[in-house]
């Protein structure tokens, strides 16, 4: 008897669904551009009638392009299909605007690392501004505690926001680690990590 090998499924890096289901989501243009850049050999099989977005344009369609597609969809012969297409295009436009706003908010934010003197020769560092970048403070504190062999905890500051407090003067190493975390997220390479 022969054993069956499990089927290998590739998941989208944008919407995290299997590639065949991306067309039903609101981030289809971004999913297509991701697939074309990461798996160009799969793009022609999943989207056979669609031109490669890398050859057409590198970014997702703008709001004006989506509006023109919306007008074309309303001119369709089937009213139900036109209505569904119009709703999908509206959701795509809203989703794209929301993503752009979040990205600009993240790019304008900064992470502050403060070095505070505890005793004459002992210091702690306080890291604040992590909530915008979706970095969980508890996981970061645990990582710092194991990485630097020091005590680390999460406390609320005066503004009722979480900040990570690490014992010892490890501000340079913490800055490097946080910059590495931000470079892993798309579009956040230029975010400032400021020691003070």
Curated annotation (Swiss-Prot):
- Tell me, what is an example of a GO biological process annotation in this record? formation of translation preinitiation complex
Its keywords, alphabetically, are:
Cytoplasm, Ribonucleoprotein, Ribosomal protein
The cellular component terms of Gene Ontology attached to this UniProt record, alphabetical and capped at eight, are: cytoplasm; ribonucleoprotein complex; ribosome
Q: Which residues form a coiled coil?
A: none
* Molecular function terms, GO-annotated: mRNA binding; translation initiation factor activity
Main subcellular location of this protein, as a coarse class: cytoplasm
- Annotated SUI1 domain residues: 111-182
Give the Pfam families listed for this entry.
DENR_N, SUI1
Q: Where is the protein situated, by its record's location annotation?
A: Cytoplasm
Q: Is Cytoplasm found in the keyword set?
A: yes
Q: What does the similarity note say?
A: Belongs to the DENR family.
Q: What is known of its domains?
A: The SUI1 domain may be involved in RNA binding.
Question: Can you state the subunit structure given in the record?
Answer: Interacts with the 40S ribosomal subunit.
Know the name of this protein?
Answer: Translation machinery-associated protein 22
In its UniProt entry, the species of origin is given as Lodderomyces elongisporus (strain ATCC 11503 / CBS 2605 / JCM 1781 / NBRC 1676 / NRRL YB-4239)
Q: Which gene encodes it?
A: TMA22
